[in-house]
Swiss-Prot record:
The keyword RNA-binding does not apply. Gene3D superfamilies: HUPs (3.40.50.620), Isoleucyl-tRNA Synthetase, Domain 1 (1.10.730.10), Valyl/Leucyl/Isoleucyl-tRNA synthetase, editing domain (3.90.740.10). Belongs to the class-I aminoacyl-tRNA synthetase family. It catalyses: tRNA(Leu) + L-leucine + ATP = L-leucyl-tRNA(Leu) + AMP + diphosphate. This is Leucine--tRNA ligase. GO terms for biological process: leucyl-tRNA aminoacylation. InterPro entries: aa-tRNA-synth_I_CS, aa-tRNA-synth_Ia, Leu-tRNA-ligase, Leu_tRNA-synth_edit, M/V/L/I-tRNA-synth_anticd-bd, Methionyl/Leucyl_tRNA_Synth, Rossmann-like_a/b/a_fold, tRNAsynth_Ia_anticodon-bd. It comes from Streptococcus agalactiae serotype Ia (strain ATCC 27591 / A909 / CDC SS700). GO terms for molecular function: aminoacyl-tRNA deacylase activity; ATP binding; leucine-tRNA ligase activity. Its EC number is 6.1.1.4. The gene is leuS. The keyword Metal-binding does not apply. A motif ('KMSKS' region) lies at residues 610-614.
Amino acid sequence: MTFYNHKEIEPKWQAFWADNHTFKTGTDASKPKFYALDMFPYPSGAGLHVGHPEGYTATDILSRFKRAQGHNVLHPMGWDAFGLPAEQYAMDTGNDPAEFTAENIANFKRQINALGFSYDWDREVNTTDPNYYKWTQWIFTKLYEKGLAYEAEVPVNWVEELGTAIANEEVLPDGTSERGGYPVVRKPMRQWMLKITAYAERLLEDLEEVDWPESIKDMQRNWIGKSTGANVTFKVKDTDKDFTVFTTRPDTLFGATYAVLAPEHALVDAITTADQAEAVAEYKRQASLKSDLARTDLAKEKTGVWTGAYAINPVNGKEIPVWIADYVLASYGTGAIMAVPAHDERDWEFAKQFKLDIIPVLEGGNVEEAAFTEDGLHINSDFLDGLDKASAIAKMVEWLEAEGVGNEKVTYRLRDWLFSRQRYWGEPIPIIHWEDGTSTAVPESELPLVLPVTKDIRPSGTGESPLANLTDWLEVTREDGVKGRRETNTMPQWAGSSWYYLRYIDPHNTEKLADEELLKQWLPVDIYVGGAEHAVLHLLYARFWHKVLYDLGVVPTKEPFQKLFNQGMILGTSYRDSRGALVATDKVEKRDGSFFHVETGEELEQAPAKMSKSLKNVVNPDDVVEQYGADTLRVYEMFMGPLDASIAWSEEGLEGSRKFLDRVYRLITTKEITKENSGALDKVYNETVKAVTEQVDQMKFNTAIAQLMVFVNAANKEDKLFSDYAKGFVQLIAPFAPHLGEELWQVLTASGESISYVPWPSYDESKLVENEIEIVVQIKGKVKAKLVVAKDLSREELQDLALANEKVQSEIAGKDIIKVIAVPNKLVNIVVK
């Protein structure tokens, strides 16, 4: 039986594409452009897993589709190669992270090429290449010049096991590090910060201009966390001290019965009484060991200590106790809150625990039983009584401003971006600290500041990076004899990935980040595909850098990525026992269609779960390509279900996709191809062209493949295949199965040219409509016959056909026809007696 020999055909076409630079980016300025971007991978030692090709196949199908539609297509690939994993591996094994990274990249590239992706490899970027990070450093110097990069002594998330501080976004909800799952503690350190807060409003507003999943926009909105409210100043009793709180509900000020400061608040030591000093000091120590996420966990028990001090509520002159509690963060708002326990759940729980007053100021609910958090008219609030929420807020803000004890205020949850890492394997920060106390950026003419090669990459132990040990590199002297020290912190992995999509546009430019005209030609990115796990970190950081570059006149657009698509996760086959615990696949046996634990004999249920080494359910694409072929993997991953759904891997599904490709191969290579069109496939062919064109454009790849299957089924029923339809069909399937597409194109045309730039097939609208139609014939209102007739017959023609039908004739034999009602394209009704 004829079948698709992937082991012969796929390497042949991969070599053809490479030798002929088939996918070199088009530069014809008269053509429309299409920029299809994948989130470039971190080249890990494990290589590609089957989750990577899902997104890559989607952008590849779009790229091949747009090339055929006459677009210049930019479809590049590169490597996000700095970062902790390579450094950890190097420390564990004694290998050089640069060598390890280069080996991993070579392996990733081999795997990617085996899958037939149409990348323009002339544009490959690598974040660890000095010719690349020269421009990462250049962007940093511009941030520094604009005052957007600054040094500060800040409490950081310190991970002892990693020897570095990490950003808030890299701390998991359980208070451990995203990388490695290590404990995170808070400690003050000198750090580089990027002033992303200066762009908070624009980062929020411009989300309206991009075509992104609403869920991702919401995650960014929540992370930026805009609140409109008021600052209120509280004086501390019997002192000259005061503190400010930010509240979104200034209208509830009459219900404020206590205040809470963050343990790190600058005022705490100054106002704490002698009686409370010991308890306060111990509480502060314990709070310093917890991450922000652990401290603000809503489910945890409320803890706190009274400072011994009282504040004066400005609106009614009442004395309220001042506490410290770790759920208030110094880094958020003003680091102090006014507590209104009657109308806030967290404040209510705290007040109940420490027996503090609860005074309702909104009508409704029973505040002895629970906080009332809905809206109601104001009570116990003097000049606000009887007002609704909006009116009361406006009136209270007016009162605060008139009395000089507060003002309207907009705040953001977003914090400045902690940008330094105390590690070796990252971009050196191009700053020199001079002994006269000044700091300067390394001039552009001296960039890149190259990361020095060293065998000793262990953290220094002092909180500085290993670069602090390299005296020759570290110490510099100015022309005037002033000595200086280079910055020893390096940039985080997020730096290189915040602008890589710009370098693809002009990757070999030695004079600038990229040529302005080329940036104008290609920006914004038309489609960006990657995992939803990057919703806040990478996507927010890249948008921030892009806006800075826009302000500098470097890029012509406000936003980098016009459309974003998050592919779903490919889940592995796994098994669950009666307790809900997952069982590794090597501990499972199949008997009579059921699954059992090898050791306990317990029957297990199949439950798809994230692929992991521990469950032994990771599928390596190399194995799939070897057994089934790259085209099978591509078609299967696109046919599994909607691209954004999470779906379980299935060997049966893979085999089904392989069988489909064999049927396609047989159809084109064994069916008689003819120049004569019988018309039998007119409708299904034109429907297929229309459906595949529309569905590829909408990224509904599974339904496009289903339509291709419909065509194959229909074509197999015919003795011959019209050559134009055979060619058109091969063009339609080529983006999904490009090796097969190229091979079958040669079978049909023997052109010696790639199918890649052959104009995409068009469809004939008139052929989409059936030329024949079924009508019913009724006698006395009951259906007696069904006729297939040409469309749009006249009443007379319909009537004649109906009366000539044998079934109808036998029904009306011997009866008088009173009248015949014929409705074109619908029915004929015969009235007899």
